[in-house]
């Protein structure tokens, strides 16, 4: 169920929930849920995107050491392609909350909608900049996913995954067109689908139409 609450009145056993990886063309969407310990404040919490990599790595360890409990979850590429990215994200958030070793009294979700949970929940727009527990969740999710992207770069070299983290940068799009999609690319995303169809046409001996400017008499 979802409730509209005055967040300033909520103190103990509030879980913050956030995700990383909705926009990339490859890799899982990663989520985290965190219940902070009011007796062990963590200085410097903020939206993970506003922190340096070194600061995120430091806070990643501190959050895991000081939080009452935390859990990192995910939805795989196959689930993203089957469900769509929104529903896969909601599923991953649900898994994160359900994975907590302590049942929260309330789950505050970054964004404008909540997954279906067995505990009260409420969305908080830009919550990773407003709610410490959501900021903590954003850090756990981002550091986890960034580390995974660095590891996948070793398995799938040539795409620059460690740098762009799977987002549709010019470098990534060029590599995708040149090399074709890997098993970790999301086939339901337009640029990946286009690259996949182009590679399939080549494998079948078909031809890919050239832009008009490249055609010669």
Swiss-Prot record:
GO molecular function terms listed in the Swiss-Prot or TrEMBL record: manganese ion binding; RNA binding; RNA-DNA hybrid ribonuclease activity
Cofactor note: Manganese or magnesium. Binds 1 divalent metal ion per monomer in the absence of substrate. May bind a second metal ion after substrate binding.
Catalytic activities: Endonucleolytic cleavage to 5'-phosphomonoester
Secretion signal span: none
Gene Ontology BP annotations: DNA replication, removal of RNA primer; mismatch repair
The entry's keywords: Cytoplasm, Endonuclease, Hydrolase, Manganese, Metal-binding, Nuclease
InterPro entries: RNase_HII, RNase_HII/HIII, RNase_HII/HIII_dom, RNaseH-like_sf, RNaseH_sf
Cofactor: Mn(2+); Mg(2+)
Location of the protein in the cell: Cytoplasm
The keyword Transmembrane belongs to this UniProt entry's keyword annotation: no
Keyword Lipid metabolism recorded: no
Domain RNase H type-2: 12-201
Record's GO cellular component terms: cytoplasm; ribonuclease H2 complex
Transmembrane segments: none
Superkingdom, natural source: Bacteria
Enzyme Commission number(s): 3.1.26.4
Binding-site list for a divalent metal cation: 18-19, 110
Family listed: Belongs to the RNase HII family.
Role of this protein: Endonuclease that specifically degrades the RNA of RNA-DNA hybrids.
Name of protein: Ribonuclease HII
The species this protein was found in: Pseudomonas syringae pv. tomato (strain ATCC BAA-871 / DC3000)
Upper taxonomic lineage: Bacteria, Pseudomonadati, Pseudomonadota, Gammaproteobacteria, Pseudomonadales
